[in-house]
A protein has these predicted regions:
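C-terminal accessory segment of soluble enzyme catalytic cores
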Residues: 195-202
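Hot-dog-fold acyl-thioester-processing enzymes
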Residues: 1-63, 116-194
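HotDog/MaoC-like acyl-thioester-processing domains
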Residues: 11, 65-152, 202-208, 214-234
Length: 234
């Protein structure tokens, strides 16, 4: 699991308030995991837009881990949550984004995500100098690893088809990270201790996806290849 570095007291940090809407909650009115993932994407986009940096690169999520604060109230319908985000570290061709969810001045959950920049052709590239100009101080020269591990799918895993929908795909032509979290939300419901989603390969339009699962783990499998893996603790 990723390390959750504390909120930086130097360099750039960005905060924005969001209202939890009807499409973000389950039948109990609690924030769904995919709703939380969308907020993480939104505040990352809003932060990057606010910097004013002009770039043709597109950042995609490689891995996201959410940790939920014991004893805190779970966000629910119409709550106003404040998301504070900053760069927690960098690697050669990736960066870590840390984000805190605060509800009424109380921390409810934390997230750490590895993002990878892609050029207009869709290929990974090194982190640009313009990125370090903005986020270098908050990263504090902390190096983060881009390596990800993969546990094999056990033979006794439960398997079910996960049909892809037109609405699952984003401007890159891949299944969006938040759509993947929708599948996770079908099998894992809050509250829980922590959950981590790792993208080993992108899910494409022609893929026929099988969800394999055991307690504590989920795999998105295409033709015997794991493209996304999930770990969680309730």
């Amino acid at each position: 699991m990723l390390e959750f570095v504390p909120l930086t007291d130097q360099g750039r940090r960005f905060a924005e308030q969001y209202i939890i809407r009807l499409g973000d909650v389950d039948m109990r009115g609690l924030l769904r995991l995919d709703g939380a993932a969308r907020f993480l994407q939104d505040v990352a986009t809003d932060d990057w837009s606010d910097t004013g940096v002009i770039s043709d690169d597109t950042w995609v999520v490689r891995r996201t881990t959410m940790r939920f604060i014991e004893g805190a109230r779970w966000p629910r319908y119409l709550d106003r949550v404040t998301l504070t985000t900053w760069c927690g570290g960098v690697g050669a061709a990736w960066a870590e984004r840390r984000t805190n969810f605060d509800l009424g001045g109380e921390r409810s959950l934390e997230a750490a995500a590895i993002w990878v920049p892609l050029n207009p052709s869709g290929h990974p590239v090194r982190v640009r100098e313009s990125f370090f100009d903005v986020y270098g101080e908050s990263a504090r020269a902390r190096k983060v690893s881009g390596r990800v591990s993969l546990t094999p799918v056990p033979d006794d895993a439960t398997r079910a088809a996960w049909p892809l929908r037109h609405a699952d795909f984003d401007i890159l032509g891949h299944v969006n990270n938040a759509a993947v979290w929708q599948a996770v939300a079908e099998l894992v419901t809050p509250p829980l201790e922590w959950v981590s989603v790792t993208h080993h390969q992108s899910l494409e339009r022609e893929d026929e996806v099988t969800l394999a699962s055991v307690p504590g783990a989920i795999w998105f499998v295409v033709d015997g290849v794991v493209k996304v893996s999930v770990e969680y603790v309730l």
